[in-house]
Amino acid sequence: MELTIFQVDAFADSPFQGNPAAVCPLDAWLDDERLQAIAEENNLSETAFVVGRDGDYRLRWFTPQVEVDLCGHATLATAWVLIHKLDDASPVLRFATRSGELSVRREGDSLAMDFPAKRPEPCATPDGLLEALGIAEAEVLKTDDYLVVVDDEKTIAALAPDFARLKGLPCRGVAVTARSQRFDFVSRWFGPNVGVNEDPVTGSAHTSLAPYWAQRLGKTRLSAEQGGARKGRLECDVRGERVVISGKAALYMSGTLHL
């Protein structure tokens, strides 16, 4: 069996930026063990598998270790492949996923993804969280991630987490965020529980980050940058119970899987 595969840098306008994702279009689903094996072999933070045509698709995402419920950057990468490599001219691409229906539309030279908003709630700071991050004091909130809000964006740039300690926490991942001089906010995201120590640009985390900062800053349109050494940029628009997350993407390579 031969399958075409693409590697796309999401939330970037050229290669070597943003967050790389593999995209594998399928005529029909392979068994779950084979999908997981492909994702493990790719060894990227996410591999997306997509089935469908003409604007109507089913989409699944796998890290090297597990299938996940939502992945923003791999959704962006998938939409880019469908539009630019598989010639889908539909004005809106719709994806049936484990998180419900998601849609992506073109907005100029960007792609806009419509996701359910997740509003973080204040919570008690779990034992070991701040110590694992090397942070003395922070505001802590929770959705499926812990959101750790610090006062200075320089703190985020200097983070060197203890991933073994983070892995024991009861969450999908940990997003650390702060106000920024160049953007409305910046962040980094760590997910050793799903096999990704640090994800360069995490679209799904912004379904929580954007509502938090929208409320705090009193605005619904927000600019964001995420990442440590490798960074990407996002535009977020909080619309009630939805968040529209926009960004660009760039093809890095394409090839053939021999299974």
Swiss-Prot record:
Pfam families recorded: PhzC-PhzF
Catalytic-site annotation from UniProt: E46
Enzyme class: isomerase
Keywords: Isomerase
One of the record's GO molecular function terms: isomerase activity
Keyword flag Isomerase: yes
GO biological-process terms attached to the record: biosynthetic process
Entry protein name: Uncharacterized isomerase PA2770
Organism: Pseudomonas aeruginosa (strain ATCC 15692 / DSM 22644 / CIP 104116 / JCM 14847 / LMG 12228 / 1C / PRS 101 / PAO1)
